[in-house]
Regions:
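Alpha/beta enzyme core
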Residues: 2-5, 10-122, 132-153, 177, ...
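Short, loop-centered acidic/histidine patches that primarily coordinate divalent metals
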Residues: 127-130, 159-160
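C-terminal helical cap(s) of enzyme catalytic domains, especially alpha/beta-barrels
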Residues: 148, 162-196
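Short acidic/histidine-rich active-site segments
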Residues: 154-162
């Protein structure tokens, strides 16, 4: 939604359609949904998203949905990442459309991550906290979710990896190595730096 507009929670699609993505031979569909149960306009966003899920399924495209729960405050809308809020939005996203096949849910990281990831049988991609910037701390932040839930299938690399003051390549490689092979954050990062 357009920030600070009266229709911000009525987050209508304004860019690519699934038909256009198919014509461009794209590999999938990606969007974000902000659910605000106390704002009636949110119901329109839920409908738009359900229609997009159905269109993607009909086209045979996987769909990746970032699930965000927001509440209305005096200063606008604030994202909530407590487990109860995340379970609600993950449950809604999991139920969007006619089928769950091909649907991946991107879930913001919190301190009880096993709880919201258990709210769906869909594959989950971790959306980590991007506060840390020191390379080893970033690797630790991006790998602490491993093994929490069997439906966690990967992680989204954010700004603190892509635009880190240090070289982002060994950070990303260390994260991938730990996700696929296990190991220690510091040792993996140092090994990846030495490979350069």
């Amino acid at each position: 939604g357009l920030k600070n507009t009266v229709w911000e929670m009525d987050d209508m699609p304004s860019c690519y359609t699934v038909d256009r993505l198919v014509k461009l031979r794209m590999d999938g569909v990606k969007f974000m949904i902000r659910l605000n149960p106390m704002d009636e306009r949110s119901k329109y966003t839920v409908r738009y998203c359900a229609e997009a899920v159905n269109a993607a399924e009909s086209a045979g495209l996987p769909i990746f949905i970032e699930a965000l729960y927001v509440e209305t405050t005096e200063t606008g809308f604030t994202m909530k990442t407590d487990s109860e809020s995340l379970c609600k939005v993950v449950g809604v996203v999991g139920a969007l459309g006619c089928r769950a096949s091909g649907k991946w849910i991107e879930v913001p990281l919190n301190h009880e991550y096993a709880v919201p990831t258990a709210a769906t049988t869909c594959p989950v991609l971790v959306v980590p906290d991007e506060v840390k910037s020191e390379p080893i701390e970033v690797v630790e932040e991006y790998t602490k979710e491993i093994g929490i839930s069997s439906n966690i299938r990967g992680i989204l690399l954010g700004r603190n990896v892509m635009y880190n003051e240090s070289d982002p390549l060994p950070i990303a490689e260390a994260i991938a190595d730990i996700w696929h092979k296990g190991g220690n954050a510091e040792e993996n990062y140092k090994r990846c730096v030495e490979k350069l």
